[in-house]
Amino acid sequence: MRFILVSKYNSVNCENRKPRPSAVGRTNNKILTVKLLLTGSGGLIGSAVSEKLHGRGHELLKLVRRKSTDESELTWDPNHAGDLRDPRLNGLAGVIHLAGEPIAGIWSAAKKRRIHESRVRGSALLARSLAKLEQPPARLIIASGIGFYGDTGERKVDESEPNGEGFLAGVCRDWEAASGPARDAGIRVAIARFGIVLSGGGGALTAMLPPFRFGLGGIAGSGRQYMSWISLEDAARAVIHLLESESIRGPVNIVAPCPVTNAKFTLALGRELGRPTILPAPAFLLRRLPGGMADETILSSSRVVPGVLQGTGFEFEHPTVEEGLRNALK
């Protein structure tokens, strides 16, 4: 199911943006204090979302893989073949599913299998269980990634773009399809397709920082490939936006409105750190990473725009890469 965009691409000046008042905390539709279920609460995005939900006064029930420590946690095994059975799951206002094996790391055959299975099996278990509840939630937000589109070159793509090719495109396709039972049960499902989330506390940027801090950073490959990114602050706010909206369903690109080439990102990062960026990483060296990781991530071009977010009035706190990096590195 695809969301009908209000406009093809809302205009954003990505080069000469003037400062404006903070947009933090502003979304269009507010809901009352409610009880919510969250998975992946210990991850980069999950931690930020959890903090914002607590700040709004919402009651959180967290699904965790370890042994639960109090009534606010419920232990689960994403690989479980049955259903989740706990009376606390009834009457939830919404569910936010962010759990999954990290993409970062060496892509061995076992790692790639964990990336796929943790997402597909966990999502299927959750969707299946929610669909069978006597009082199912009204809304389910399930994470995915812009890897859904594959390598799209220099073309701007929004949520209407079809599924691409490659390992990550296949993972995202199966991941999103696993939410089918929830949709069939009448639950409003929004698919959050995350881009590169910029944070100094984890994720892709943290892995890039050591060489850049020592002045050893540079472009990857040709540097012409596009990177679709979003600040952690805006990513968490976007999840809240999906939760609080009564109309959004289907895929939603969680990216800033100003994707940049790897060359521009590299230059911006060097400027923020006050370091030179003159040592490139040739594509042939990057392709020595196992499992096709370089071609799927570092060298893949994704010029993805946030059509649904812009079409539903979401305001970005950090729309340009300079602002996103400055916020992440402060």
For each predicted feature, which ranges?
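NAD(P)H-binding glycine-rich loop region in Rossmannoid oxidoreductase-like domains
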Residues: 68, 72-125
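N-terminal Rossmann NAD(P)H-binding glycine-rich loop of SDR-like oxidoreductase domains
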Residues: 36-56
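Active-site Tyr-X1-5-Lys
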Residues: 165-189
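C-terminal amphipathic/interface module of NAD(P)-dependent oxidoreductases
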Residues: 295-330
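Alpha-helical substrate-binding/gating segment
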Residues: 209-217, 225-260
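Mid/C-terminal beta-alpha module of Rossmann-like enzyme folds, strongest
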Residues: 245-292, 326-330
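Glycine/proline-rich active-site loop of Rossmann-fold NAD(P)-dependent oxidoreductases
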Residues: 173, 185-187, 198-207, 242-252
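Conserved Rossmann-fold NAD(P)-dependent oxidoreductase catalytic core, especially the SDR/UDP-sugar
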Residues: 124-166
